[in-house]
């Protein structure tokens, strides 16, 4: 009977023992989040309001239409090794998806 009390007492100590995380995260309170407009200015991208005002004036520049994402995205995709590129979808697979599965 004494052995079971000792076993349960040691279990309690194991449960109460504080958990120490193995991963250390940086203290985020010291690093304030940057403002979106500041980030865009530092990246050299046009801000949202300036691009809207240019677009609404009727000046449809081909640059605006071509660059929907970051300017270097297309170049990054071209430099990726084949194993990381998106696989092409065959015509048979497209038809299968379009009809919603097997017939």
From Swiss-Prot:
Supply the InterPro entries for this chain. Answer: Kgd4/YMR-31
- Phosphoserine modified-residue sites: 61, 90
Question: What are the Low complexity biased-composition ranges?
Answer: 47-61
> Per UniProt, which keywords does this protein have?
Acetylation, Mitochondrion, Phosphoprotein, Tricarboxylic acid cycle
Q: Which GO terms describe its biological process?
A: 2-oxoglutarate metabolic process; tricarboxylic acid cycle
UniProt region (Disordered), positions on chain? 23-70
**Annotated positions of the N6-succinyllysine modification:** 5
Q: Name one GO molecular function term.
A: protein-macromolecule adaptor activity
Q: Where in the cell is it found?
A: Mitochondrion
Taxonomic superkingdom? Eukaryota
Q: Which GO terms describe its cellular component?
A: mitochondrial inner membrane; mitochondrion; oxoglutarate dehydrogenase complex
Carrying N-acetylmethionine, the residues are 1
Q: Subunit structure, per the record? A: Component of the 2-oxoglutarate dehydrogenase complex (OGDHC), composed of OGDH (2-oxoglutarate dehydrogenase; also called E1 subunit), DLST (dihydrolipoamide succinyltransferase; also called E2 subunit) and DLD (dihydrolipoamide dehydrogenase; also called E3 subunit), and the assembly factor KGD4. Within OGDHC complex, interacts (via N-terminus) with E3 subunit and (via C-terminus) with E2 subunit.
Which PANTHER family does this chain map to?
Answer: 28S RIBOSOMAL PROTEIN S36, MITOCHONDRIAL, ALPHA-KETOGLUTARATE DEHYDROGENASE COMPONENT 4
Q: What does this protein do?
A: Molecular adapter that is necessary to form a stable 2-oxoglutarate dehydrogenase enzyme complex (OGDHC). Enables the specific recruitment of E3 subunit to E2 subunit in the 2-oxoglutarate dehydrogenase complex (OGDHC).
Family, per the entry?
Belongs to the alpha-ketoglutarate dehydrogenase component 4 family.
The name this protein carries in UniProt is Alpha-ketoglutarate dehydrogenase component 4
Annotated source species: Bos taurus (Bovine)
Source species taxonomy = Eukaryota, Metazoa, Chordata, Craniata, Vertebrata
Its gene name is KGD4
